[in-house]
């Protein structure tokens, strides 16, 4: 029944780092309003790949967007969240920095906002109002991309430093200051989006989801100026924060999840069943009840960089498998493996490959199976 289905406002805080959420007073206020999941593995730590995985519930090999240069490759036979919602009575809209980064399937309204010239603090609330009005009582889905972190990264980093310029990597302290400043802007923006829901009087039937597609490096890894070159925690560990009338408040989970879990979760929250088999699993019950959220046994991530020592924009060549404690990274082009104990070495500094840990062979076998599926 359409009248019982919630509105969904899906807000991408593009490039946000899990470990810097605390520096925004506004975002910390929002955290108290809902449930934060802060250990969700990005399937591809760059926007094109990441959002297609999120909105299809399928990895890149299956959905067709498995490389930087395959942005338009979404397969027609793959379920696409806005289209599924539209077919089930939703009015849908989106506001992106570039309309070409995502398939038009299933969207009633598509807006493109110039990241250098337009104020998203104004434009996005206006789009929510327009969507609500044009929905005419139907439930609505709005996907918003807050791109300020991306804008600053491109302007202050990519346009100033080549990937092998040591000046950038030797300036991590200032890089972090730059990042923190723009993330505070993201927190202010997020609060404005929360406020517009209250202003419209729709908070009783609206689920707000603030999330990131990937993190942003500040020079931790030589060869990665921002994201997409490797699969370390600063770029693949992401968060999703759910706020809604039935969502638990002031709740947090560090359980290991995957980006492929988001698609079935949103459909569950909207009470829309799908018959197609999904690699992910819904955690909607955890969001709305006292049930425990179990760790995924393993999660997977992959990338192929535009720049850097292992550039491969056509197809992924860096892969990783992650458990609740360990991560194994495979650099395919140079046939190099790196194993990290995330509990004792959260910054992934010491490669413990070859220390005869039983988990090493299990992770290697599972990762190769996933790559060659």
Q: Which residues does each PLM region occupy?
A:
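Catalytic domains that recognize anionic headgroups
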Residues: 1-373
């Amino acid at each position: 029944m359409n009248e019982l289905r919630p509105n969904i406002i899906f807000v991408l805080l593009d490039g946000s780092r899990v470990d810097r959420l605390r520096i925004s007073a506004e975002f910390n206020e929002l955290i108290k309003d809902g449930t934060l999941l802060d250990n969700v593995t990005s399937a591809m730590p760059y926007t094109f790949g990441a959002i297609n995985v999120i909105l299809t519930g399928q990895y890149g090999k299956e959905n067709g967007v498995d490389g930087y240069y395959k942005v338009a490759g979404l397969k027609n036979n793959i379920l696409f969240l806005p289209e599924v919602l539209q077919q089930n009575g939703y009015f849908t809209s989106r506001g992106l920095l570039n309309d070409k980064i995502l398939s038009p399937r299933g969207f009633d309204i598509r807006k493109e906002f110039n990241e250098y010239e337009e104020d998203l603090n104004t434009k996005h609330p206006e789009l929510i109002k327009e969507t609500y009005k044009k929905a005419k009582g139907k439930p609505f889905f709005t996907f918003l991309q807050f791109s300020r972190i991306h804008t600053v990264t491109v302007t202050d980093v990519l346009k100033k430093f080549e990937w092998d310029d040591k000046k950038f990597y030797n300036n991590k302290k200032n890089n972090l200051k730059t990042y923190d400043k723009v993330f505070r802007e993201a927190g202010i923006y997020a609060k404005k989006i929360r406020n517009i829901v209250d202003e419209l009087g729709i908070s009783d039937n609206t689920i707000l989801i603030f999330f990131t597609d990937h993190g942003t490096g500040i020079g931790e890894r030589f060869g990665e100026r921002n994201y997409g070159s490797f699969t370390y925690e600063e770029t693949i560990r992401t968060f999703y924060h759910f706020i809604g009338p039935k969502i638990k408040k002031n709740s947090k989970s560090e359980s290991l999840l995957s980006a492929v879990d988001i698609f079935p979760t949103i459909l569950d929250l909207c009470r829309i069943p799908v018959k197609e088999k999904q690699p992910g699993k819904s955690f909607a019950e955890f969001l709305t009840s006292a049930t425990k959220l179990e760790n995924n046994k393993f999660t997977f991530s992959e990338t192929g960089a535009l720049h850097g020592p292992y550039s491969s924009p056509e197809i992924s060549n860096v892969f990783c498998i992650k458990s609740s404690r360990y991560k194994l990274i495979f650099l395919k082009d140079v046939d190099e493996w790196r194993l990290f104990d995330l509990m004792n070495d959260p910054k992934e500094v010491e490669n413990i490959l070859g220390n005869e840990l039983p988990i090493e062979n299990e992770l290697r076998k599972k990762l190769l199976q996933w790559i060659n599926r």
